[in-house]
Amino acid sequence: MAEPETLNLNNEVVKMRKEVKRIRVLVIRKLVRSVGRLKSKKGREDALLKNQRRAQRLLEEIRAMKELKPDVVTKSALGEDINFEKICKKPDSTAAERAIARLAVHPLLKKKIDVLKAAVKSFKDARQNVVEVKSSNSASEENHSKDTLCSNDDASKLQHEGTIIREQKEKEAKILAKKPINNSKEKIAKMDHGPKAMDVPNSLSKPSGKDSPASSASQKTPSDPKMKALSKTKKMKESSSSLDVDSDGEELYEEEKEYFDDSTEERFYKQSSMSEDSDSGDDFFIGKVKRARKKESSCRFSDKEQNPPKNLLLEEGILETHQNLQNDKNKPRTEARRFESVFFQSLSGSKSLERNHREQVPRSKTMDFQHIEPQNKNQFNKKAQRGFENTKQKSQLPLHPSWEASRRRKEQQSKIAVFQGKKITFDD
């Protein structure tokens, strides 16, 4: 049977504090009203004095109630059955006793106290039942232990008898085993002569076994030098491949470096002195950019020159002659080239460039032809023919600078897209 839930009376008393305070307020309010009625009554002097004494006693009870603690009221109500009439009739009763009795008799508090009393009583009964069950269980356990002791004694006796019987059987078996021992000895003596004859061929076979490891060792030795030679060749291949990789990496690194000498700078200044009104800073940076471009183009065509296509062998001769002519004509023009404006090229050029533009043939589109990779044979031929026609036409009909400037301006204006958005109007 399971133990009942523990009832902590102190916790219940603490929970009752709120109820006791609420009931105390109600009782004090009632007593104050009764005191007011007693004082307002009129009559004879004896009746007035009697009413005053009652009112005085009620005031004392009110003061005692205010000083009382709620826990005292609940404990006294739980401990005894309080009768308010008996306590009031006592001549020596104090104001505190009367106040406790008055509060305990209140119907709201009395209900709570009755519930607590019933819970305490049921808890006590449950505890008593648990004690009785435990005592009965202990008695049954004692009886069971006595029975087990008796059964253990019987089992020990049976085991002792069984051991005695086993010992007797073992003795009998030993006596029977001694008799056939003599017969077995004679059989063993006969069997000893057989193994001696069998040992002779075994001894002859042993030296042949010794020769086998020697032959296996001789087989292993010739294979060792071959393995060593293979391992050496593998190591040599790995080292050579690593050296090739390192050398390729160094060559690429040297090609990527930008080579810049004083001799190239002096040569560039000599060539640029031919043009008029040229700035030294711009020429310096332009030369550097040109050299970088030439290096990139040479790197591109170095791979293609190793495997040139057969179809382009005849065209290379024509292009070389054409490029030599163009380079001789446009040499001072290209060396004095500057970064030009995106929108109006005429604004960025100097006066010397304008004079050179009048005198010299305009630059053709085929100047940087060698930088473009030929994709197809037909395109290559068409571009070469266009370059020849343009140079002939421009050399025959040189335009005035003002006409050329207006033409360029119109081209730039035609490239600018027209505004296609909506106009925003701001209303009042």
UniProtKB/Swiss-Prot annotation:
Gene Ontology BP annotations: maturation of SSU-rRNA
Principal location class: cytoplasm
Crosslinked positions (Glycyl lysine isopeptide (Lys-Gly) (interchain with G-Cter in SUMO2)): 190
Taxonomic superkingdom: Eukaryota
Pfam entry (one): BUD22
Residues bearing the modification N-acetylalanine: 2
InterPro entries for this protein: Bud22/SRFB1, Bud22_dom
One of the record's GO cellular component terms: 90S preribosome
Biased composition (Acidic residues): 245-264
Modified residues (Phosphoserine): 203, 205, 263, 278, 280, 348, 350
Positions of region (Disordered): 132-155, 175-284, 350-428
Subcellular locations according to the entry: Cytoplasm, Perinuclear region
Role noted for this protein: May be involved in regulating transcriptional activation of cardiac genes during the aging process. May play a role in biosynthesis and/or processing of SLC2A4 in adipose cells.
Subunit structure: Interacts with SRF. Forms complexes with SRF and SRF cofactors ARID2, MYOCD and NKX2-5. Interacts with the N-terminus of SLC2A4.
Name used for this protein in its record: Serum response factor-binding protein 1
Protein species of origin: Bos taurus (Bovine)
